[in-house]
Amino acid sequence: MNTNNRHYHITTFGCQMNKADSERMAGILDNMGLISSEDPNKADIILYNTCTIRDNAEQKVYSYLGRQAKRKHKQPDLTLIVAGCVAQQEGAALLRRVPELDLIMGPQHANRLQDLLEQVFNGNQVVATEPIHIVEDITKPRRDSKITAWVNIIYGCNEHCTYCVVPSVRGVEQSRTPEAIRAEMEELGRQGYQEITLLGQNIDAYGRDLPGVTKEGRNKYTFTDLLYYVHDVPGVERIRFATSHPRYFTERLIRACAELPKVCEHFHIPFQSGDNKLLKAMARGYTHEKYRRIIDKIRELMPDASISADAIVGFPGETEAQFENTLKLVEDIGFDQLNTAAYSPRPGTPAALWENQLGEEVKSDRLQRLNHLVGVKAADRSQRYMGRIEEVLVEDMNPKNAAQVMGRTRGNRLTFFEGDIAQLKGKLVKVKITEVRPFSLTGEVKEFVLV
C-alpha cells in the first residue's frame, strides 16, 4: 500500500472519548506514512468520528458526508470513513444512505484502523461494528496537545439510562489494567505532559469487570485504588478525570481526591434532572438528595472545589413543577459550569417510544430559562476568584489576543493573562486574578511554579 504524499483529515464530533479515539487513529495514520491536513478538501482520506448522543450532531455528520460524497464522484480515489457512534448504530444501513462510503467502523475498532484500511485499499467496502474485546493501547496517539493528554481507562457502559444510546454503541464496560494505565502515564510524563485526564463513559465504575475482590468484599481494583496507584507518576503534576456517575461516586473516592495533591479540585458529575420521579424514569439510579449529599461532602473536604455537570430539559412527561425542581437544584448548588441540552429522542432507546413527548417550543423555553440561571450562578461563583492567586497551566496563545496566553486553573477555569507563549507554554504559573466572568478569568503573572 503506497501512502506517499497522501493526506488525511479527521473531523471529531462529541465527547472527550471520541477526541481520544481520534488521537489514537491519527497516530495509526501517521505510522502508516500519511500526512495530516487541516483542510478536508485537500485530503485523500477523510474520517468522520461521529456522535449520536443528540440528533443535531448526527445530522451535521450527514451534511458533511453529502458534500464529500459529491466530491468522490469527481475524485474516485478519495477514501471516506465513518467511525464512532453513528457508525456503530447504523452499521451497513449507512451504505444505503451514503453508498460512496469505503469504511464504517464502530468505536471498539479504532485500534484496527490500519487493518481495515488495508482491506479498503484492496478494493473492499468494509463494515466493522461487531463487538470485540478491546486490547491494550499499543499505538502512540498523535496528541493535539503537548501539555495535556487524555488516557482511556475504561471503555463502554453497563448502565441503561432510558434516553441514552451509549451502551448500545460503545458496548459493555471493559477496564484496562492498572499496570497498562500507569505505563502509559509514565511514558507521557517522560514526554513532558504535565496534566492527564483519565477518561471513561462511567469512570467511577472502573475495575468492576476486572478479577478479584478484597477481604472487605469490594472489587480488588476500583477507581479510587487506581488514583492512589498512579498518583506518583514522575513528571505528571495534575490529574483530572471524567465522566463520573453519581451512583458510584463514593465517600472513599472523595476522600482520596482531597488527600492526593495531584488530583485537581474539579468534579464533573452529571445530575440530568433535579426531580426524583424523572430520575427514576431516566433509570439513573439515584435521587436528587443523594446527589446533593455528594456535593456537600466534596465541599466539606475541598471547600474551593469546582463542580460541573450535565442536565436535560424537556424529558418525556416533564411537568413545569418537575422542571422547577431542576432549577431549584441548580440554584441551591451553584455550578461552576453546566452543560445543558433539550431532550432529543434517540433511536433504539425506551424514552424515544413514549407517548408523552414534549413540544419543541416547551423544550426551547425551558432550556433558555435554565441557561439564564446557569449564567447567573456561574457569575456568582466566579466572584470568589477576584484578587486571588491561582495556579495556571499555560496551554496556548489567546486566539483573540496575541499578547495574551491562556490556560486553566486547578478548578478548570479558563484564564487569560499577558505573556510570551514561547516562554510560558507548558509552564505552571501563579496568576493574580484581576477580572472575572461567568466562565473565564483574566489575571497577571506573579511567579513561576518550580516542579
Swiss-Prot record:
Pfam families: Radical_SAM, TRAM, UPF0004
Residues given in the record as [4Fe-4S] cluster 1 binding sites: C15, C51, C85
Limits of the Radical SAM core domain: 143-380
Domain annotation TRAM: ranges: 383-447
Any one Gene Ontology BP term: tRNA methylthiolation
PANTHER family: CDK5 REGULATORY SUBUNIT-ASSOCIATED PROTEIN 1, MITOCHONDRIAL TRNA METHYLTHIOTRANSFERASE CDK5RAP1
Subunit-level organization: Monomer.
Chain's role: Catalyzes the methylthiolation of N6-(dimethylallyl)adenosine (i(6)A), leading to the formation of 2-methylthio-N6-(dimethylallyl)adenosine (ms(2)i(6)A) at position 37 in tRNAs that read codons beginning with uridine.
Protein name: tRNA-2-methylthio-N(6)-dimethylallyladenosine synthase
